[in-house]
Amino acid sequence: MYTKDTIVAIATPQGNGGIGIIRISGIDALEIAEKLTKKQLKPRYATFCNVYNDNEIIDHGIVIFFKAPLSYTGEDVVEIQAHGNPFILNLIIKAALNCGARMAKAGEFTERAFLNNKLDLAQAEAVADIINASSEIAAKSAAKSLQGDFSKEINNLLEKLIYLRMYVEASIDFPEEEINFLEDQKIHSSLEEIYKVILAIKNSCKQGVILAEGITLILVGKPNAGKSSLLNALAGKESAIVTSIAGTTRDIVKEHIQINGVPMHIIDTAGLRNSDDIIESEGIKRAIKKIQEADQVLFVTDDYTNSQVKFSDIKEIIPEFYDQIPKDIDITYVHNKIDLLKEVPHNHANHIYISAENNIGIDKLKEHILNKVGYTNQNESIYTARERHVTAINNAFEHIKLAKEQLELGNGELLAEELLIVQEYLNSITGEFSSDDLLGEIFSSFCIGK
């Protein structure tokens, strides 16, 4: 918990606006605010007043004092609502610094809220998720996490797990009771229930990560196969130049869209071929690098006569780059220009037939993309999650499986050890046991005013 210093920052986005908010938090927040306003501020009252630097008026606005612990950070907090001109706001910041405050670090207000038990770590991360949400569903899901829905699931699970651990360890510590707890049906049923709950949370977390972080799609293929046309069709607008000249796209073209509320980061790349053009060759190198970062690759081809096209075909197109491409990457083969066919083949497995230019098959392709990443559109029950949550849940799931094995083998002490490991992984999600390095990494990704 912070007790000795007071921080200040602009809490509203950069740029001009009707209102700009300065946030001050810490032990001297009230004293500093009263120096700036020359007013005595009452808790939870909106006070209209001038804001001064010494005796010079900087601006006027509304000032609200939130007395600890009834504030966002759990400390004394003052918010100054001034005119949203960056020069004015920076003058107020300088005046606050002159009165003894210091500039807040990124995410420091929310970090203080976490350290003062105003919210747990999962809720703190949801603050960033709700700010950065790029779709309505993502925003609603982040709000669920911020309200504590995700944390409640974890805490309810922890209660069951701790009760089971107490029972198991008590039985080990008091063998004179001559109770063979390993044959107790309560142990078996309780462990099975915990296993099923972790599995359900594991699946929900996967959905939550998709909403929070989106899906990165990369379009690759030979020149003039229709990658840029497909990008425009998916985006619903002309984001990339489309011509009949091979090699038109020479650099990475990015577009951010939504499919059924799921954020999609689509990347169009230079056509894959051997080229003497220095710029085009550099574009191809960048394309190969982006393939390694993708959640899913759309391999666009107009070779609609060959439904058995494989990613190894790249070896023939650009053999010098083939070894740099992950062989286990998730690929959908998009057969373009089916409007030239008399009879349209049926979609099968990872092969989808479309006409990007005529918008044929695009909806089926979108549906296929969502299915491939495992998104099930459970709007009402999804909360946002982070990759670290998924990692923790996956680890907890593996160890709860080991716990079941130890129970079947009759190894009581090893069962207790596995249950403890599961508890530690679950605790890391809400921040019960979190290293300083982890906290620093999480809160440094926030904007300054949060």
Curated annotation (Swiss-Prot):
<dbReference type="Pfam" id="PF10396">
    <property type="entry name" value="TrmE_N"/>
</dbReference>
<dbReference type="InterPro" id="IPR025867">
    <property type="entry name" value="MnmE_helical"/>
</dbReference>
<dbReference type="InterPro" id="IPR031168">
    <property type="entry name" value="G_TrmE"/>
</dbReference>
<dbReference type="GO" id="GO:0005829">
    <property type="term" value="C:cytosol"/>
</dbReference>
<dbReference type="Pfam" id="PF01926">
    <property type="entry name" value="MMR_HSR1"/>
</dbReference>
<feature type="binding site">
    <location>
        <position position="224"/>
    </location>
    <ligand>
        <name>K(+)</name>
    </ligand>
</feature>
<keyword id="KW-0460">Magnesium</keyword>
<dbReference type="InterPro" id="IPR027266">
    <property type="entry name" value="TrmE/GcvT_dom1"/>
</dbReference>
<comment type="function">
    <text>Exhibits a very high intrinsic GTPase hydrolysis rate. Involved in the addition of a carboxymethylaminomethyl (cmnm) group at the wobble position (U34) of certain tRNAs, forming tRNA-cmnm(5)s(2)U34.</text>
</comment>
<feature type="binding site">
    <location>
        <position position="450"/>
    </location>
    <ligand>
        <name>(6S)-5-formyl-5,6,7,8-tetrahydrofolate</name>
    </ligand>
</feature>
<keyword id="KW-0630">Potassium</keyword>
<keyword id="KW-0819">tRNA processing</keyword>
<dbReference type="InterPro" id="IPR004520">
    <property type="entry name" value="GTPase_MnmE"/>
</dbReference>
<keyword id="KW-0547">Nucleotide-binding</keyword>
<feature type="binding site">
    <location>
        <position position="23"/>
    </location>
    <ligand>
        <name>(6S)-5-formyl-5,6,7,8-tetrahydrofolate</name>
    </ligand>
</feature>
<dbReference type="InterPro" id="IPR027368">
    <property type="entry name" value="MnmE_dom2"/>
</dbReference>
<feature type="binding site">
    <location>
        <begin position="243"/>
        <end position="249"/>
    </location>
    <ligand>
        <name>GTP</name>
    </ligand>
</feature>
<dbReference type="InterPro" id="IPR005225">
    <property type="entry name" value="Small_GTP-bd"/>
</dbReference>
<keyword id="KW-0378">Hydrolase</keyword>
<feature type="binding site">
    <location>
        <position position="79"/>
    </location>
    <ligand>
        <name>(6S)-5-formyl-5,6,7,8-tetrahydrofolate</name>
    </ligand>
</feature>
<dbReference type="InterPro" id="IPR018948">
    <property type="entry name" value="GTP-bd_TrmE_N"/>
</dbReference>
<keyword id="KW-0963">Cytoplasm</keyword>
<dbReference type="InterPro" id="IPR006073">
    <property type="entry name" value="GTP-bd"/>
</dbReference>
<comment type="similarity">
    <text>Belongs to the TRAFAC class TrmE-Era-EngA-EngB-Septin-like GTPase superfamily. TrmE GTPase family.</text>
</comment>
<feature type="binding site">
    <location>
        <position position="245"/>
    </location>
    <ligand>
        <name>K(+)</name>
    </ligand>
</feature>
<comment type="subunit">
    <text>Homodimer. Heterotetramer of two MnmE and two MnmG subunits.</text>
</comment>
<dbReference type="Pfam" id="PF12631">
    <property type="entry name" value="MnmE_helical"/>
</dbReference>
<feature type="binding site">
    <location>
        <begin position="268"/>
        <end position="271"/>
    </location>
    <ligand>
        <name>GTP</name>
    </ligand>
</feature>
<feature type="binding site">
    <location>
        <position position="248"/>
    </location>
    <ligand>
        <name>K(+)</name>
    </ligand>
</feature>
<dbReference type="GO" id="GO:0005525">
    <property type="term" value="F:GTP binding"/>
</dbReference>
<dbReference type="GO" id="GO:0030488">
    <property type="term" value="P:tRNA methylation"/>
</dbReference>
<feature type="binding site">
    <location>
        <position position="118"/>
    </location>
    <ligand>
        <name>(6S)-5-formyl-5,6,7,8-tetrahydrofolate</name>
    </ligand>
</feature>
<dbReference type="GO" id="GO:0003924">
    <property type="term" value="F:GTPase activity"/>
</dbReference>
<dbReference type="GO" id="GO:0002098">
    <property type="term" value="P:tRNA wobble uridine modification"/>
</dbReference>
<feature type="domain" description="TrmE-type G">
    <location>
        <begin position="214"/>
        <end position="374"/>
    </location>
</feature>
<keyword id="KW-0342">GTP-binding</keyword>
<dbReference type="InterPro" id="IPR027417">
    <property type="entry name" value="P-loop_NTPase"/>
</dbReference>
<feature type="binding site">
    <location>
        <begin position="224"/>
        <end position="229"/>
    </location>
    <ligand>
        <name>GTP</name>
    </ligand>
</feature>
<feature type="binding site">
    <location>
        <position position="228"/>
    </location>
    <ligand>
        <name>Mg(2+)</name>
    </ligand>
</feature>
<protein>
    <recommendedName>
        <fullName>tRNA modification GTPase MnmE</fullName>
        <ecNumber>3.6.-.-</ecNumber>
    </recommendedName>
</protein>
<dbReference type="GO" id="GO:0046872">
    <property type="term" value="F:metal ion binding"/>
</dbReference>
<feature type="binding site">
    <location>
        <position position="249"/>
    </location>
    <ligand>
        <name>Mg(2+)</name>
    </ligand>
</feature>
